[in-house]
Amino acid sequence: MALEDRCSPQSAPSPPGCLPHSPPQQHQHILQPNLRIHAIPISITALDMSLQPGTAATAATLYQQQQLQHLHQLQQLQQLHQQQLAASAGVFHHPSTSAAFDAAALHAAALQQRLSASGSPGAHSTGACSTPASTLTIKEEESDSILGDSFHNQTATTATEEDEEEDDDIDVDDTASVSGSARLPPPAHQQSKQSKPSLAFSISNILSDRFGDAAKQTKQGDSTGVSVSAAAAAASIFRPFEASRAAAATPSAFTRVDLLEFSRQQQAAAAAATAAMMLERANLLNCFNPAAYPRIHEELVQSRLRRSAAGNPNAVLPPTAKLTEPSVEKSALGSLCKTVSQIGQAQSTTPVTTPSSRPSQLASPPPASNASTISSSSSTAASCSASSSSGCSSAASSLNSSPSSRLAGANNASSPQPIPPPSAVSRDSGMESSDDTRSETGSTTTDGGKNEMWPAWVYCTRYSDRPSSGPRYRRPKQPKDKTNDEKRPRTAFSSEQLARLKREFNENRYLTERRRQQLSSELGLNEAQIKIWFQNKRAKIKKSTGSKNPLALQLMAQGLYNHTTVPLTKEEEELEMRMNGQIP
């Protein structure tokens, strides 16, 4: 932009002996077609005025003419901007435009005083060219330097005034692109907002130190391609941000390797948590853990001891009260489980022990499996204090060990066979219907080939994701105690009664209470007999016709109403097969 070029502190003239290093300038493309500003080509001697000391007077004259032309153009631009502000009051302008044009007005007044005082070009080469980004007021010396070096790119052009008149519709910068130096496209806000009658630019482009440094580097660089790419990046509207991002010295601390390592650690932690959760779930589902189910474990061991005591009368059976001394009242669940567990088993006589024999039983504990059961039950403190230390240690290890190690320890320590968990019978006992027959018989075959009776309440615990759907097995039908004499005799209707009932049925299939009472008095029958006859007659007609309501057809198609008493029609069979997915 022309305004940016005039107000930018980075475009000061170079000191003598060096090439000019101001960034490539873009003129403001004025949007009104009748007001266009064209650069008047100046002689090439204005560029190398500092390199030819012999032609100092000519260079000073040309430089003064150039300054006057710039002043005239700056005044025109200021008037144009004031007209635009008056015409488009509702358009939002960048907050930096007013400050920039105030600085331009101050600059014009100062320049006129300087030119009236002395026209020497050396006075305009004051070297302040790095204004801080926070400064919004441009000093007089810097303003002179800015104006002195603002149109260096236009002095190097070789186009004539006729060429500029032909290229009226082209930006002023395009006429200067024939020079040897690499020119840049106009900024993004000039390319995309040609139709908007406003002057909007960023204050960071004017007051940025980084952009001036980047422009110097691109001017002094040897590689043309690198300088063009860096200057193109700096020519966008976010030039300071692009330059600072490109000049980042330290890379990011969070690299791709760190990201992969972090994701790998997360996956490992998730896998460990999943494994621990699955192990805990397996321990709870595959066996009756004594810590989780103390009552169930106690009942299992009690039923096992009863069976072993029935086979071996000399076996020592600890009384039940010994296992549940702290809980004086027996829970209803435990009593019910014991009662159910004794169904279908041989009744064993439990030896009654006197209180004097209890210390001897505690002093000589039963096998290790019983000791571990006692220590893991509700009377842990009383049992562990009297039983051997080996029994307590085996109990403590059995609480924390896996089911397989617990079973192996019981095999090594005790002579009787351990009770296998329900998972040994069926892993998916809640899903399959094959366990219905097992629960009816109540016997399973262990690894040793020995037939063992399981208590019936074991199969009441369901490991299923389905809701409750009734009993787990079919109950055997109870033998009917009623004899044929107690049954109600079948009513034998006479021909006159049947004829009258049929005639009434043909008139109306449903009887009212008054009509039923009249028929009862006329035919000498009970009201219940007449009502039942009408119900049976309606059912026979319904079966013979085979017509079903739509709800029954829908339920049959879903398999929820599959009564086989009525044969299905072809349409119903086809509908049912289609609903079941047998036919497409």
Curated annotation (Swiss-Prot):
Superkingdom of this protein's organism: Eukaryota
Keyword line: Developmental protein, DNA-binding, Homeobox, Nucleus, Segmentation polarity protein
Protein name from the UniProt record: Segmentation polarity homeobox protein engrailed
Protein family: Belongs to the engrailed homeobox family.
Name of the encoding gene: en
Organism: Drosophila virilis (Fruit fly)
Pfam families xrefs: Engrail_1_C_sig, Homeodomain
PROSITE patterns the record matches: ENGRAILED, HOMEOBOX_1, HOMEOBOX_2
Keyword DNA-binding: yes
One MF annotation (Gene Ontology) recorded for this entry: DNA-binding transcription repressor activity, RNA polymerase II-specific
Record field: compositional bias (Polar residues): 189-198
